């Protein structure tokens, strides 16, 4: 497919605008609200465990945010869910910059859709994908509100990030010097 075809899907497919809006909406919400919403969903008596029971997957019911094996993965999932719409818009904008001539030349040479994707689309989006990855890494380092709203750094400090550790040391345990040192160390990074 040509890049214009990929972008033009929004006018050809039914429900694409709703799909795009549903993907982008989480980006607009404050991370504290997102964290609290998912906290209630992943509670032991929350809607996710209830759904698992209803569809017959009772063996998978667990305290997602309390179990050390699943707490960090659950937070990562929520963080990805909250940010995927932002990167979707950036990548869609990048798709519009790929010239149609390249895809037409590949079609004449007999390239399949998969070959076009991996040999044309991905390489031409590489700078945009690299920027998205860099922005996500920087954003992940400074996450506080999502982790604080969902676990507060628990269980047993397993989901502590430098920001939540700094907050807990300074304001929960009244170790102001340690909290300040963590903040200064974070500033130098």
Question: How would you describe each model-predicted region?
Answer:
Residues 1-188:
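A structural signal for multi-pass alpha-helical bundles of membrane permease subunits
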């Amino acid at each position: 497919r040509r890049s214009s075809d990929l972008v033009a899907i929004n006018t050809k497919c039914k429900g694409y605008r709703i799909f795009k809006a549903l993907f982008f909406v989480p980006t607009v919400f404050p991370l504290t609200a997102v964290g609290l919403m998912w906290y209630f969903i992943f509670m032991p008596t929350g809607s996710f465990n209830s759904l698992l029971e209803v569809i017959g997957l009772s063996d998978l019911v667990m305290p997602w945010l309390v179990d050390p094996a699943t707490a960090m993965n659950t937070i990562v999932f929520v963080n990805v869910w909250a940010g995927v719409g932002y990167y979707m818009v950036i990548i869609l904008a990048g798709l519009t910059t790929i010239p149609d001539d390249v895809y037409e030349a590949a079609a004449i040479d007999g390239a399949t859709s998969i070959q076009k994707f991996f040999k044309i689309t991905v390489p031409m989006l590489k700078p945009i994908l690299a920027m998205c990855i860099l922005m996500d890494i920087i954003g992940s380092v400074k996450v506080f509100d999502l982790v604080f709203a969902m676990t507060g750094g628990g269980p047993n400090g397993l989901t502590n990030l430098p920001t939540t550790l700094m907050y807990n040391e300074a304001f929960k345990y009244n170790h102001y010097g340690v909290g300040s040192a963590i903040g200064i160390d974070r500033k130098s990074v």
